[in-house]
């Protein structure tokens, strides 16, 4: 399969009466001439790294090498455990995990780029949160990663997953779309509903710029991961309820590509615009590097 159209993937899944994850695993096995069991075990290792990166990021004492960030996941976790958060248990735990993984990345810890390091907290936060809440077996979570990967590959092929090309909409947007699609499948949705979840999640983040303070993947990147996982749950919830995207996923992806092309280079990972160019952003840059 070419992985250049989500609609085509869904059509093929429906034709073969398979969930997206099994279609993708079967195709990848044939394309790479590798046994499905081997591919599954490889993906399972990624899930293990994701889970470990959550635990690492919950350490309230760790700060990034720059000193700009650290401890937010710990603070959020304490609020959730004390039942002081306003968004409920699932949203609270998802935000905790997204912050934790992103913080692990900022501290140079081991993470899974899903699809990028800058958006690494969104997918694991979504899948680990729902699996814990619903007692979903790890094997099912691993399979959902194949669905997420296929969605990410379509976005990469049709547009981009790089902030330097498409802004943060390409990174956190892609991750949120991947997570939403996988959430739908984990919760018993159809391939078509996964497609709608992808479209809804991505169009909610269209236009989001990449403006890292001091050029580091910390401010505002870490908190944007919390936003991205919340958006994934919103999109999945809507899709599972039967809400459909008026604009097909493939067209939303293309729109994201065109928006990225229209963005100023100052808003695509160069740290020359947006939050990076604010007075405070510049002061933080000087604090880290001595100049800005």
PLM regions with names:
Residues 1-109, 133, 242, 249-292:
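Generic N-terminal targeting/processing segments that precede catalytic cores or assembly contacts
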Residues 37-49, 63, 89, 93-96, ...:
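Conserved active-site and cofactor/substrate-binding residues in soluble primary-metabolism enzymes
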Residues 86, 113-120, 132, 136-143, ...:
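Glycine- and small hydrophobic-enriched segments that form the cores of compact globular domains
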Residues 103-128, 169-174:
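Glycine/serine-rich anion-binding loops at beta->alpha junctions
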Residues 146-178, 182, 204-231:
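A structural-propensity feature for long, helix-poor, extended segments
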Residues 89-105, 140-159, 204-212, 247, ...:
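Acidic-glycine-rich active-site phosphate/pyrophosphate-binding loop
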Residues 185-292:
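Functionally critical mobile loop/hinge segments
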Residues 124-135, 180-188:
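Alpha-helical support elements that line or immediately flank enzyme active sites
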């Amino acid at each position: 399969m070419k992985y250049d159209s989500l609609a085509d993937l869904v059509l093929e899944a429906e034709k073969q009466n398979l969930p997206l994850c099994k279609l993708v695993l079967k195709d990848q096995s044939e394309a790479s001439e590798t046994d499905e069991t081997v591919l599954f075990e490889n993906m399972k290792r990624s899930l293990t790294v994701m889970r470990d990166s959550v635990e690492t990021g919950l350490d309230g004492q760790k700060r990034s090498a720059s000193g700009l960030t650290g401890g937010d996941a710990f603070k959020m976790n304490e609020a959730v455990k004390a039942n002081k958060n306003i968004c409920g248990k699932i949203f609270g735990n998802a935000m905790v995990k997204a912050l934790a993984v992103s913080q692990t990345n900022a501290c140079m810890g081991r993470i899974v780029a899903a699809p990028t390091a800058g958006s690494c907290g969104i997918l694991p936060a979504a899948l680990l949160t729902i699996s814990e809440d619903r007692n979903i077996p790890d094997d099912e979570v691993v399979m959902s990663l194949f669905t997420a990967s296929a969605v990410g590959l379509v976005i990469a092929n049709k547009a981009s997953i790089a902030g330097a090309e498409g802004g943060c909409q390409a990174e956190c947007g892609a991750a949120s779309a991947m997570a939403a699609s996988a959430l739908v499948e984990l919760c018993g949705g159809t391939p078509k509903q996964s497609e709608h979840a992808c479209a809804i999640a991505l169009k909610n983040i269209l236009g989001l710029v990449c403006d890292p303070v001091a050029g580091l993947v910390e401010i505002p990147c870490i908190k944007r991961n919390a936003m991205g996982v919340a958006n994934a749950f919103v999109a999945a919830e809507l899709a599972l309820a039967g809400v459909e995207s008026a604009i097909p996923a493939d067209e939303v992806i293309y729109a994201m590509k065109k928006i990225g092309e229209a963005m100023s280079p100052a808003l695509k990972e160069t740290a020359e615009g947006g939050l990076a160019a604010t007075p405070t952003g510049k002061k933080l840059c000087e604090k880290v590097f001595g100049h800005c």
